[in-house]
């Protein structure tokens, strides 16, 4: 089965198996396939895919990198480029990224820059990669722990999503992807939330496939309105402004999803402080939805997970100054929630600049609660 979920802003296919020759039908055997993955997936998932490609007449090469966010560096990026150069890979070859968000971010950036661009196919193997990282063409690497400081917009030729590959993952890893599902529900499509009410239901393939499909459609719908991230696409940054600042400070000691979960809670508190959010019930609902999947909802939760001494308010404010959205203001603009399923719009803009005083007040209240509860 190959189901076309959408073809805008690029084709996204839901498949029941990656061992389907029809997936390769649009590719020419005149040029090689270059797979980029990590060392674990190279042994776990890739062999049958490589065998199929070879049986169809393709020349195949595999490049592997270590697992983890710490791999997402300039050194890794240049090493992959050097390997492509050593192999004398032509720009007509197709680069296929197989893995989670880290792999797809790096592989997409390599594809965008090798010989000024080569075809790229994403095969996401985690939930967050299936519903978020593989969609929309954003790619890049970190610089000195600053998230995605160097990167580009480069749409993939296709995304192939096989929900069955999630069976390789522990339950906790699946829950990490739920954070992005919840984000989509709160900024654009509240109809996603009923699919998240029973965590056990997601153990069923049909329920999980439906969740993936709805989230793919949600993100694709937002992206196709604003591929270059100048307007509507900015709502996808909900939770990520503070979340990325926290990731920078924690230096790999917390998963991306945990930072984003707390980021969403804090940015909803900002929305309430500014009178943008229509009801405190939005915050209560968000917290319950996150807790259902054992995701953190406070700074205290993060520090308990990371087992490191707390930072202070000034350190978080300083980390925020490196945000990519920052303009000629002390702080970057923030996405605000108006109601569940609706990100706020400010005269056609979807991010709001706030005063340092208001953010400091929200953060100080959070630190006070951490030290006194």
From Swiss-Prot:
One of its GO terms (cellular component) is cytoplasm. Its cofactor is NAD(+); Co(2+); Zn(2+). One of its GO terms (molecular function) is 3-dehydroquinate synthase activity. Pathway: Metabolic intermediate biosynthesis; chorismate biosynthesis; chorismate from D-erythrose 4-phosphate and phosphoenolpyruvate: step 2/7. Its EC number is 4.2.3.4. It is found in: Cytoplasm. One of its GO terms (biological process) is chorismate biosynthetic process. Binds 1 divalent metal cation per subunit. Can use either Co(2+) or Zn(2+). Its main location: cytoplasm. The keyword NAD applies. It catalyses: 7-phospho-2-dehydro-3-deoxy-D-arabino-heptonate = 3-dehydroquinate + phosphate. Zn(2+) binds at residues 180, 240, 256. SUPFAM superfamilies: Dehydroquinate synthase-like. Keywords: Amino-acid biosynthesis, Aromatic amino acid biosynthesis, Cobalt, Cytoplasm, Lyase, Metal-binding, NAD, Nucleotide-binding, Zinc. NAD(+) binds at residues 67-72, 101-105, 125-126, 138, 147. Catalyzes the conversion of 3-deoxy-D-arabino-heptulosonate 7-phosphate (DAHP) to dehydroquinate (DHQ). Belongs to the sugar phosphate cyclases superfamily. Dehydroquinate synthase family. This is 3-dehydroquinate synthase. It comes from Chlamydia trachomatis serovar D (strain ATCC VR-885 / DSM 19411 / UW-3/Cx). The gene is aroB.
């Amino acid at each position: 089965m190959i189901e076309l979920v959408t073809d805008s802003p690029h084709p996204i296919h839901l498949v029941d198996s990656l061992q389907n020759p029809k997936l390769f039908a649009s590719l020419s055997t005149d040029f090689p396939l270059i797979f980029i993955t990590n060392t674990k997936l190279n042994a776990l998932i890739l062999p049958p895919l490589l065998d199929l490609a070879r049986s169809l007449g393709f020349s195949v090469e595999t490049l592997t990198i270590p697992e983890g966010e710490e791999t997402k560096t300039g050194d890794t990026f240049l090493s992959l480029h050097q390997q492509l150069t050593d192999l004398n890979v032509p720009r007509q070859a197709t680069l296929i990224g197989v893995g989670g968000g880290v792999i797809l971010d790096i592989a997409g950036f390599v594809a965008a820059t090798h010989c000024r661009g080569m075809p790229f196919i994403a095969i996401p193997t985690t939930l967050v990669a299936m519903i978020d990282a593989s969609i929309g063409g954003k790619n890049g690497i970190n610089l000195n722990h600053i998230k995605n400081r160097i990167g580009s917009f480069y749409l993939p030729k296709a995304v192939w999503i096989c929900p069955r590959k999630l069976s390789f993952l522990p339950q906790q890893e699946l829950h990490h992807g739920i954070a992005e599902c919840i984000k989509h529900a709160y900024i654009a499509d509240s109809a996603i939330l009923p699919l998240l009410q029973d965590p056990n239901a997601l153990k069923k393939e049909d329920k999980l496939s439906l969740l993936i499909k709805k989230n793919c459609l949600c993100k694709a719908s937002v992206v196709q309105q604003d591929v270059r991230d100048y307007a509507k696409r900015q709502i996808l940054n909900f939770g990520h402004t503070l979340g990325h600042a926290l990731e920078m400070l924690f230096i790999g000691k917390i998963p991306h999803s945990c930072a984003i979960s707390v980021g969403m809670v804090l940015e909803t508190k900002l929305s309430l402080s500014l009178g943008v959010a229509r009801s405190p019930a939005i915050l209560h609902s968000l917290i319950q939805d996150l807790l259902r999947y054992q995701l953190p909802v406070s700074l205290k939760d993060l520090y308990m997970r990371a087992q490191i001494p707390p930072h202070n308010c000034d350190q978080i404010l300083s980390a925020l100054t490196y945000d990519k959205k920052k303009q000629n203001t002390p702080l970057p603009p923030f996405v605000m929630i108006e109601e569940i399923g609706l990100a706020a719009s400010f005269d056609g803009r979807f991010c709001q600049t706030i005063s340092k005083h208001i953010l400091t007040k929200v953060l100080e209240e959070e630190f006070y609660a951490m030290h006194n509860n």
